[in-house]
Amino acid sequence: MEKLFNRSDRIAQELQKKIAAIIQHSLKDPRIKTIITVSEVQVSKDLSYAQIFVSFLESDNNEKVKKKITILNRASSYIRKLLCKRMKLRIVPNIIFHHDDSFLKGNKISCILENLTKKE
């Protein structure tokens, strides 16, 4: 029987759940009090780094999004410390946050397609 997921994929899924819970319940910074969705986690093969892709409910202002990503990256050591307590890993990866704008791009494409169908 072959494995469907390798270890880094399983750890990425678990990190996604734990980081979403930490952001929602443990971060008390009022500057990021908005709905934050952890959309994807990519873990390096040696599990030393994790890239966390997040999207925000209010993501229309690019400067606000950059500030929120900066705040999350500054809080990454605190989030990593909480992850060390909640996960049984020998090495908890360093965390780097990135903005995931795929939902906005998909929404823009669907609006363009909708306008094209209305013109026909």
UniProtKB/Swiss-Prot annotation:
According to its UniProt record, where is this protein located?
Answer: Cytoplasm
Q: Which organism is it from?
A: Buchnera aphidicola subsp. Acyrthosiphon pisum (strain APS) (Acyrthosiphon pisum symbiotic bacterium)
One cellular component term (GO) for this entry is:
cytosol
Relate the protein's function as given in its record.
One of several proteins that assist in the late maturation steps of the functional core of the 30S ribosomal subunit. Associates with free 30S ribosomal subunits (but not with 30S subunits that are part of 70S ribosomes or polysomes). Required for efficient processing of 16S rRNA. May interact with the 5'-terminal helix region of 16S rRNA.
Description of how the protein assembles with itself and partners: Monomer. Binds 30S ribosomal subunits, but not 50S ribosomal subunits or 70S ribosomes.
The gene it comes from is rbfA
GO BP annotations, alphabetical order: maturation of SSU-rRNA
User: Pfam families, alphabetically?
Assistant: RBFA
Keywords assigned? Cytoplasm, Ribosome biogenesis
Cross-referenced Gene3D superfamilies, in alphabetical order? 3.30.300.20
Mind telling me what this protein is named? Ribosome-binding factor A
